[in-house]
Amino acid sequence: MGKKSKASKKRLAKLERQNSRVPAWVMMKTNRDVQRNPKRRNWRRNDTDE
């Protein structure tokens, strides 16, 4: 594990933001058409290619 560069840290921060569930209000607004986030990722199981 070396030092994280600023660019690498920025990419990891973006992946962390993307790794969240679909908000409840979106599910309500779309009448549950949108229920899951296909970009969900587990920190232990899935790789980020970073």
From Swiss-Prot:
Basic residues: compositionally biased ranges: 1-12
Record organism: Halobacterium salinarum (strain ATCC 700922 / JCM 11081 / NRC-1) (Halobacterium halobium)
InterPro entries linked to this entry: Ribosomal_eL39, Ribosomal_eL39_CS, Ribosomal_eL39_dom_sf
Signal peptide: none
GO biological process: translation
Protein name, per record: Large ribosomal subunit protein eL39
Record flagged with keyword Transferase: no
Pfam families, per database record: Ribosomal_L39
Family matches, as NCBIfam families: PRK01242.1
Keywords of the record: Ribonucleoprotein, Ribosomal protein
Region (Disordered): 1-20, 30-50
